[in-house]
Regions:
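Hydrophobic transmembrane alpha-helices and their helix-loop junctions in integral membrane proteins
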Residues: 1-193
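Cytoplasmic/organellar membrane-interface segments at the starts of transmembrane helices
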Residues: 132-135, 185-254
Length: 254
C-alpha cells in the first residue's frame, strides 16, 4: 500500500502539481502563451511520454514497468498544461486525478501478487490470474483505463487532451498521445494475458485464492471508480465537475 501511494499519488504528483501552480498562478496563462514559453517544455514533455512508454515495454520487473509508465503519464499532465486552450487544461487536471486512481490500482494489484505468490517479474506471472481472479479483474480494468478504452476514466482524459491539442492547432501532440496509447497496450496487456493464460509449474495447493480482504477491497474500489468516472463523467461525484470549474476560472478572463 505504501509503495502504491508513493508511486501513484503522493510523490510523483508533486512535480506535476508544482508546474500547474507555476504556469497558472505565478506566470499566468496569457503570459506563457504570448511569449511562447510553453513550446520548448511541450516538446520535452512529448519526448518523455514516448520514451517512458517505449522503455516500459521492455521491463521484466513489473514495478519498474509501471514506473516508466508513470513517467510517461505524468508527462501527459505536463503537456496538457502547456498546450494552449481550456480543453487541454481540463484534460491535464483530469489526468492528475484519474491517473492516480488507475495507477494506484495497478500497484496494489502487483502488491497482492507479490504478497500471495511472490510474483515480482513478468516471467513469474504464469497462471496467477486464475488463482487471483478478482485482483486480475481490477488490474485489467485499470490497464484498459490507462490505455484509454471507452467507458473508462482514461478515455475521458485522453478525449479532452486530444481535442484540446486539435483545437490549439498542435496536431503533432495528438499523434504523441496515439503512439503512447498503442505502446501502453504492449506493456500492460501482456501482463494480463500471461497472468490468465500462462501455465504455472509451481505448487500452490493449500494457499487459497485471493489475499486478505483488507488487501483485496481497495483495488476493487479504485477499479470501480475507474469505470464510474468514465461512465458517469458529468455527475457531481466525478472529478470532471471540479476540473471544469478550475478551467473556467483560469480562462475566464481570456
Amino acid at each position: 500500500p505504501v509503495s502504491a501511494l508513493l508511486h501513484a499519488v503522493a510523490v510523483v504528483k508533486a512535480g506535476a502539481f508544482g508546474i500547474v501552480r507555476l504556469v497558472y498562478e505565478l506566470y499566468g496563462v496569457e503570459l506563457v502563451q504570448t511569449m511562447n514559453l510553453w513550446q520548448p517544455l511541450a516538446y520535452l514533455a512529448a519526448f518523455t511520454i514516448l520514451f517512458g512508454s517505449f522503455m516500459a515495454v521492455f521491463q521484466e520487473e513489473l514495478k519498474k514497468r509501471l514506473a516508466y509508465s508513470t513517467m510517461s503519464h505524468l508527462s501527459y499532465i505536463i503537456l496538457g498544461i502547456l498546450l494552449p486552450g481550456q480543453l487541454s487544461t481540463m484534460g491535464a487536471l483530469l489526468h492528475l486525478v484519474n491517473h492516480g486512481i488507475m495507477k494506484i490500482t495497478l500497484f496494489m494489484c502487483l502488491g497482492n501478487y507479490a504478497e500471495k505468490y511472490g510474483v515480482h517479474k513478468f516471467k513469474e506471472l504464469d497462471g496467477v490470474g486464475k488463482k487471483m481472479p478478482l485482483t486480475t479483474i481490477a488490474f485489467t480494468v485499470a490497464s484498459l483505463g490507462l490505455i484509454g478504452m471507452p467507458m473508462t476514466a482514461g478515455y475521458l482524459t485522453k478525449k479532452y487532451l486530444e481535442t484540446g491539442a486539435k483545437n490549439a492547432g498542435e496536431v503533432w501532440a495528438v499523434y504523441v498521445f496515439y503512439i503512447s496509447s498503442i505502446l501502453s497496450v504492449f506493456y500492460l496487456m501482456p501482463i494480463v494475458f500471461r497472468a490468465l493464460f500462462g501455465k504455472s509449474e509451481k505448487e500452490t495447493k493449500g494457499k487459497g485464492l485471493e489475499v486478505n480482504p483488507l488487501m483485496l477491497i481497495p483495488p476493487l474500489i479504485t477499479a470501480f471508480l475507474t469505470l464510474l468516472f468514465g461512465i458517469l463523467p458529468p455527475e457531481p461525484i466525478s472529478p470532471l465537475k471540479w476540473v471544469q470549474y478550475i478551467a473556467n476560472k483560469v480562462y475566464g478572463g481570456y
